[in-house]
Amino acid sequence: MFYSIFIIDKEGSGAQRVPAVEAHRQYIKDRAHKILAAGATFADDGKTVRGGSYIVEMDKDEVERFVAEDPFTLAGIREKVIVQPWIKACFNGEFLITVTPPGPPDVNERLIEPERKSA
C-alpha cells in the first residue's frame, strides 16, 4: 500500500539537522526501492528547510519504523508527522483512476499527450 508522509520540522532546528544530513541521505538511499517520491519542503524564502514529504510503498508498521528510525527523527528535529494512505490517481502525466459512470468502465484517460519524437 502507498502512504504519504508529510513532516514539519521544529522551528530553528537547522543546527541539529546538519550533523544528521549524511546519515539521513544514506538511510533514504538504502530504502529507495520502497520510495516513489521524496524531498525536502522549504519555507517561503525557498532556502530554509522546514521538513519533507514522501510517497512510500510500505505497510503501516514499516511506515512507522521508517519515520521513527530516520536519523532526522532521532536527532529530535521533527515537530509534526502526518501519515495517510495514498492512491496513485495521477502519475507521470497520466490519470490512473478507472472512469466511473457516465463514462465507460475500465477506461484510463491521459491528462496530457506524450511528447512525440521527431523522425
List PLM regions with ranges.
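Conserved, structured core segments of small domains
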Residues: 1-119
